[in-house]
From Swiss-Prot:
Keywords: ATP-binding, Autophagy, Cytoplasm, Kinase, Membrane, Nucleotide-binding, Protein transport, Serine/threonine-protein kinase, Transferase, Transport. PROSITE patterns: PROTEIN_KINASE_DOM, PROTEIN_KINASE_ST. Homodimer. Forms a ternary complex with ATG13 and ATG17. Serine/threonine protein kinase involved in the cytoplasm to vacuole transport (Cvt) and found to be essential in autophagy, where it is required for the formation of autophagosomes. Involved in the clearance of protein aggregates which cannot be efficiently cleared by the proteasome. Required for selective autophagic degradation of the nucleus (nucleophagy) as well as for mitophagy which contributes to regulate mitochondrial quantity and quality by eliminating the mitochondria to a basal level to fulfill cellular energy requirements and preventing excess ROS production. It is a peripheral membrane protein. This is Serine/threonine-protein kinase atg1. ATP binds at residues 13-21, 60. The lineage of its organism: Eukaryota, Fungi, Dikarya, Ascomycota, Saccharomycotina.
Amino acid sequence: MIISGKYVIEKEIGKGSFATVLKGYIIDDNDNNGNDTNNEDVEVNDDKRKYTTRNQIAVKAVPRSKLKNKKLLENLEVEIAILKKIKHPHIVRLIECERTSTDFYLIMEYCALGDLTFLIKKRQEIMENHPLLKSVFKRFPPPSKNHNGLHRAFILNYLQQLSSSLKFLRSKNLVHRDIKPQNLLLATPFVDYHDSKSFHDLGYVGISSLPILKIADFGFARFLPNTSMAETLCGSPLYMAPEILNYQKYNAKADLWSVGTVLYEMCYGKPPFKASNHLELYKKIKKANNTISYSNDCEIEDDLKDLINALLTFDPNKRIGFQEFFDNKLVIEDLSKYEVANEVYSELELKSKSVLESNMFISEYLPSEKKKDDTDNMIISNLSTNDRINNITIFSNILPTVNENENDKTNDNSTTNYNNNDNENNDNNNTNHNYNNDKVNNKSNDNNEKSDINRSNSNYKQHSTKQTTNELIPNTNTITTNINDNSNSEMNSQSARMMQKSKNYKSLRNNKLRNSKNDIINNSNSDLILEKEYVVVEKKSVEVNTLADEMAQIGQINNLNYKVPYPSRSPTLAGNVLQNNESLQHYQPFSVKSPRTSLSSNGSGNSRRASLVDRRLSISSLNPSNALSRALGVASTKLFGSNVLPNQNAGVGNANNINTSMPLLNPQVFQDLTENILLRVDQLQGKDRINIDSNSIVQILESLAAKAFVVHSFAEVKFSQTIPLKSLSTSTVNRPANDRRLNDRGCAIEEDDNIQTETYDTYIPSLKGRSLSSLSQTSICSQDLPHGELYQLSKEAIILYMKTLSILATAMQITSNWWYQSNEKNCSLRLNLLVQWIRDKFNECLERADFLRIQILELEECENKSNELNSDHTDVETSGVNETVHNNDNDANEEDQIYVEKLLYDRALEISRTAAKLEIQGDHLNNCELAYATSLWMLEILLDDRIEDDNFNEFSSKNSAVLDDQDREIIKKYIDSIANRLKALREKISQGGS
């Protein structure tokens, strides 16, 4: 194939999420023969072509169809713009960029020797099979056979070449942000020079007889002056600076940390820090306290250790600076002593030209890679970042994933990948060479997964959720979820189904992991998880987590400095305090009985209503009480330690003699706080629009938290229905009595929550960022639901999660404005607890949305394959009506568009009607109260003005309907009606009607 009449594309050498990289060459006048081929695809007979040093190229082809939103297109344009501006001998050169109506073609400098990982991970095979590198390693043998470290000549050569390129980038105020061995390409030596003098005259540094290092992949690069700080989290975790891992702002010094990790790996053949996820990695780095562990297998000089220590300094302010690095004696050391003799020069030059003329990429010399090429036709699985999904790539809970086909084993490393999304999958199979910077989050490799969710403005064919989801999807008929609450038998059936689905959710994940071509429990594989990971996290997620961490830290300090005595004896104290003190700062804990026992006031006949934790829900589709309680409980435990009082079983006499530092939170206060958020709907409605000050911030956040919670609960119902359900051959009757709901006081939801707490936390992270190739033959194609229904449910769930994220982002923005404008950094316990809950839900929704995004893409892939198969057996006899059909499809899409307003409206009315039926029957009045409150919150959301200042607005605007005045009036009437019912119900409950 010929591009623009002068570039011939040959075989593929790499493939990524959005781009394919191919080898090629530039046509000279004799090849073209004066024919105007322009953009036509022309086959060229090049069997007898003699490849020269000047005509070989690498072509990165990016189909426009893959760039489905503006952000992804901008990322590519930024890379092109940067590469056009920079020309340096140790940076991969962009020769030209060609654009057609269907594709972008980046014509780039070709590096035939792969990347630095080949010399480290594949050294033994290279020494045996590659003619040029065999001679080079013979001249500079590795220091030890026990590890993959390189000879000092290699180390200093590449250190100086890397330093030279970074010095140039800093002169242009550029920061690369993804320095790692996979992005350090190696070009064949002796291409434009014949001796050491001509080598240096061309601007090269180092040793002329060694492969030449060139920095590639500027997809994460950006202009960043020395005094500026960046907030976007990106790069590969194993090589990422700790300040980025910890969501902090960072400057160009982050690149120096990456240089330190690369330098260490060249010395010892492995990164300095390894972990199974980025959080553990950060903990290890911090725990090391600037003490780097050096292996006894190989001794390196003290100067190298000192430089590594200076580069791998935890605090960026204490880390070595660029100028000091550039002036380091190792960086400026004269390496002429490593230059070879003239006769050796001639031998190496002949072998170098032979390699070039053979037109063979480095992986083609390796026996293991040749075998893979025969099996897979040189196709590699793609690892993508986090993309970047547009503005958000999921950054947490990175776990390995798998291919279940035996043949998929070859997909990971069959060739060198010019896409920076593709990296080695294990220590012995690392041949992926990164040229392509299309770090498109949302697809992943077998042993490695990326998060990335995209929130973008794309049409409703693919939704985006990075820090959130890549574009979402077309539209189909809305499906409302029926509430099975008309009878106990129906509720038992629904309960069994939900529990079975939760179990299958975990089972599905385990099955996929079980099919991995390498045992993920193997230490060597787990060490590489992060090495293959890309991460991009945009500002909104960083702000949410940073603010929550700051407030949590202050909460801990307040807790440590406060001594709390036991009170006299009133277990109802907390409820009164919460009701009367909105800005609760400190209060006295009280002794409480087990959460399963009822509480009464001491001695008085005044008994308080059972808390939501005690009043188990029997409406199966409602899940606010214990879920919110559990979430808040987890947050409070993280903040203030255990919420169980050490001496709660002690007698009152003993308690009176104790005056010690106690946790500020205990179970009863926790339950009261949970109740107030949802059940105080009449007090909190409209509070999010009042002026913000220290007295009103809690009410504002409670209002927004309640709104976010009811939408999130609805999303969870939809989400649970997308989990594959195995046949219920073992009915609930056969299950142990303690594993099923026996009567109307049983709590199926509570049991499900216990299961889901485990399964969601372990399953979703392993699915994030997975490539379609690794998913296409797994769960989705064998779901118990029809594809259409599953597709619809996934779409509805992701819309609801995005709405939740929008509300939570607004809550955190309001909190941030108040927090940083306030003179006092003193927050109440309740406020702190709310912020932690909002943060937890925010991160959880990102994970759910990422999973759904992958599932949606997977379903679309299955559907496309099915359509292709059907089209092969269908005669084309309807050409005359194509236009009519197309128009009808467009009309259908308009009618089938899913709007979050309609989902919430239908759900609110459904809940209130169900509650009304139960109220008439006199059953579960406390749960009816909760149902009415939930319905009111949902309707209240519909009257809110659209949120304009959060990162999810673009996404929301595509699936949000504009309500006219008539719609609003109808909603207000329903609110008034339901509020009256709620008021009457509460009077009935207070009179003992429950």
